[in-house]
Amino acid sequence: MRNLLFVFILSMISTTPSLALGNYKNGTIAFERGDYKTALKEFTDLTEQKDSRGQYGMGLMYDLGTGVSMNFEEAVKWYQLSAEQGNADAQNNLATMY
């Protein structure tokens, strides 16, 4: 029974990053297609996991006003959170906004 529990926990840990990658990929594809509702959902799910790519995606949506009302304060907030985790795209966009 312990071995089964160990295998289950190990499988959950090993699939979590790939699930986050899937959310980001799905969000990016939706964004590029103009399906901003789906992109917003995918990026929101990622931000709840403190994922820098999701935070960057949210910043971009608020920066451009795609799928949400344009809001530079919100864009800066999301870019800042992402930039603090080392996301170079967020760092660049944040610098451009200042």
Locations of regions flagged by a protein language model:
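Short helix-capping/linker turns of helical repeat alpha-solenoids
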Residues: F31-D35, E48-D51, L64-T66, N71, ...
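Sec/Tat signal peptide C-region and signal peptidase I cleavage site
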Residues: T16-A20
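Bacterial N-terminal signal peptides
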Residues: V7-T15
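Hydrophobic face of amphipathic alpha-helices that form TPR/SEL1-like repeat modules
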Residues: N23-A30, G57-L64, N93-Y98
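Positively charged n-region of N-terminal signal peptides that target proteins for export
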Residues: M1-L4
